[in-house]
Each structure stands twice: as C-alpha cells, then as structure tokens.
Amino acid sequence: MKKTIFAICAALLALSCTQAEAPKQQPLENSVVYEMNVRQYTPAGTFAAAQEELPRLAEMGVDIVWLMPIYPIGVEGRKGTLGSYYAVKNYCEINPEFGTLEDFDNFVAEAHRLGLRVIVDWVANHTSPDAVWVTGRPADWYERDAEGNTTFTADWSDTANLNYENKDVWAGMAGAMR
C-alpha cells in the first residue's frame, strides 16, 4: 500500500513539475497598433493620465501602444513654442512634462498587465542642436557641411544630423538604448 501511495505521489509530482506553456501572443502582422502622442492624448498630457485610458484601448482591441518620442525636447532652433518630439535633447531621460521615469514604468506595467505591448519611438537619425551629445561629444558625432557647420534635414532647424560613419555614434546609440 505504501508503495502504491508513493508511486501515485511520485507520478503526480512528476506531472506537476512540467513548465506551463507561455501564453501565445498574436503575430505582429495581425496586431492593432495605436500611436499615442502623450502630450495631446489627455488634457493633462502625462503618463499617469494616459495610463487611465489604457483599459479603454484594450477594450477597443488595441494590441500595441506606440508612444511618440518621450525624451526631453531641445530648445535651440525650436520649431514653434513646444518644439518637435524628434528634436531629442537627451536619450537617457524622460520629458518632464510627461512625468517621471517611475510614471513611465507604471504606464508600461499597467499596459503589460492588460496584455498590451508598448513601443517607444526611437529617434535614430538626429538630435536637437543643444543635445547633450552636441555639447558633450567630439564634433565628428554630427554630419558637417563644407564649412564645418552641423547639417540639418530639410528645414528641420531643430534636428542636427548624426554621423553614422563614426562608430562611436553607433556605440552611443546602443548605450542609450540600454
């Protein structure tokens, strides 16, 4: 009898030790992506206010929330009074008008709890003219014209083009993404 009980317990234990399958996520090509401009999404324009809207997005069938750039915006050469999200001043900080890093982390945690994925728009081609990389890096981090002036894309006077021929720029980008 003891051997039978032991065998049953051993079998149950062995069966209960198998790993549960991870929940299957919908293939990306079938996903509903919602682009969110945090500044304009709610009257408050913050992560905390946007977080309150995540259940509604999940109910609408959204799978992925794509946040427009969330980094501080440069001031030099600024277009308009608010500036362009794509004129990144510092890749390693959160735009304070949206809240804190903790507010962002809470937003992402709530999105994940609701089964939503979050994508953060990464601005890889350029920074603002007054970005920490412009003032704190060698001049060869940026594309230069024949006179040695930083180049800009089209009429985007608030975005200085990065020089990807410099491998340090590649390393800097990889480091900022961590």
Predicted segments, located by residue:
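C-terminal motif of bacterial Sec signal peptides marking the signal peptidase cleavage site
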Residues: L15-S16
